[in-house]
Amino acid sequence: MDTRAVSVVIPTYGRGQVLLDTVEALLSLSNPPGEIVLADQTVRHDEAAERVLRGWDDGGQVRWLRLSDPSIPRAMNQGLLAAAGPIVLFLDDDIRPDAELVEAHARAHLARPGELVAGRMLQPWHEGRADPEDKVPFGFNTLAPRSVTEFMGGNFSLPRDAALALGGFDENFVRVAYRFEAEFAFRWLQSGRRIRYEPGALIHHLKVPAGGTRTFGEHLTTMRPNHAVGAYYYALKTQRWRGLPSAVRRLGRAVATRHHLRRPWWIPLTLIAELHGFLWALMLLGRGPRYLGRGED
């Protein structure tokens, strides 16, 4: 499969130079994708970044979608709709792509049509080394391909038509959209499709501390339910009331951490965040999923 059949979609929020570096690296690949679509939720870039992005958009190197109201699944859905290629490759906005990233995704789809391809994510703490093949939990950083049941949202590709047939990503996953990938993977597998981990499709994730989902803060040091709501919504949506035991276990685990042992004053604040997240998840569950083309059903 030609790499020109691949549309790269990059949801981005609050990122400046690292976003420009990411796009520049993709444009410089010897076998680049057919297009790069930026689903940009940033309210305002600095003047220099704005000038570069506008130049790319005007010159046709990049399609620059300006979106309001930050939402990871909504940005991904808008990128999915805008993509022209039959294969859509979603990437984080703070990465360094391997030279054969797009080629590896294209080859995987040629070898296994119709599957979702989960790429390898080399994180800063890996220090350039792969994980052992038997590492638990699986961290998408081994050297052997395998069938998997989930994927990481910063490096995966799938057939556009198949994703649209499922309604895209559930926009009920708010704020940091925690577990939105797991919920989509659940629906993908339930529909009879498969997920394949492909280690040759490699990115170096820079994990820049500013911007992106980290704008909403860290889950250990906030009383906001930005992480908890996604965890509870995922459990209840995929398991219904059978998900209640796992929800109760999460409530206990949320305060059974070294952070809370050393800073016990965070325990009541964390419990407030968790309970708020659980109630919010119940409300979202009652309202029904928000898929592409269906609104709130």
Task: Name every feature range the model reports, one short phrase each.
Residues E24-P33:
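Short, acidic, metal-binding catalytic loop of nucleotide-sugar glycosyltransferases
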Residues F156-L158, A162-G167, V174-L202:
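A short, conserved alpha-helix in the catalytic core of glycosyltransferases
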Residues A25, D40-R51, I95:
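A conserved acidic beta->alpha catalytic loop
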Residues L67-A83:
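Glycine-rich, basic loop-to-helix element that forms the pyrophosphate-binding segment
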Residues V88:
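Short aromatic/hydrophobic "clamp" motif used to bind/position activated sugar donors
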Residues E100-D131:
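Conserved donor NDP-sugar-binding/catalytic core segment of glycosyltransferases
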Residues P73, Q123-P124, N141-D161:
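A recurrent flexible, glycine/aromatic-enriched loop bordering the glycosyltransferase active site
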Residues T221-N226, Q239-D297:
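Non-catalytic, C-terminal membrane-associated alpha-helical segments of glycosyltransferases
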